[in-house]
């Protein structure tokens, strides 16, 4: 089930994005990207619709999926 990012409390959204970025790793290619920059990139992807927040009822987990879904 897709959860609109606008319906998530700001602090919860911040924590969700941070956890996603840390879990995905830090290999961004030739250019080093700071944690804050990567968090901002994911937030922008959510706002633009390039990423969505997905809740799995089966596993009772929340994840961020980037395009393509």
Curated annotation (Swiss-Prot):
Pfam families per record: UPF0270 (PF06794)
Lineage top rank: taxon: Bacteria
UniProt cross-references to InterPro entries, sorted A to Z: UPF0270 (IPR010648), YehU-like_sf (IPR036685)
NCBIfam families for this protein: PRK04966.1
Protein family per UniProt: Belongs to the UPF0270 family.
HAMAP family found in the cross-reference section: UPF0270 (MF_00690)
Protein known as: UPF0270 protein VC_2612
Organism: Vibrio cholerae serotype O1 (strain ATCC 39315 / El Tor Inaba N16961)
Lineage of source species: Bacteria, Pseudomonadati, Pseudomonadota, Gammaproteobacteria, Vibrionales
């Amino acid at each position: 089930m897709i959860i609109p990012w606008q319906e998530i409390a700001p602090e919860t959204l911040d924590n969700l994005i941070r956890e996603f970025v840390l879990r995905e790793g830090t290999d961004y290619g030739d250019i080093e990207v700071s944690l804050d920059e990567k968090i901002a990139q994911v937030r922008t992807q959510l706002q633009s619709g390039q990423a969505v927040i997905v809740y799995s009822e089966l596993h009772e987990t929340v994840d961020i999926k980037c395009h393509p879904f």
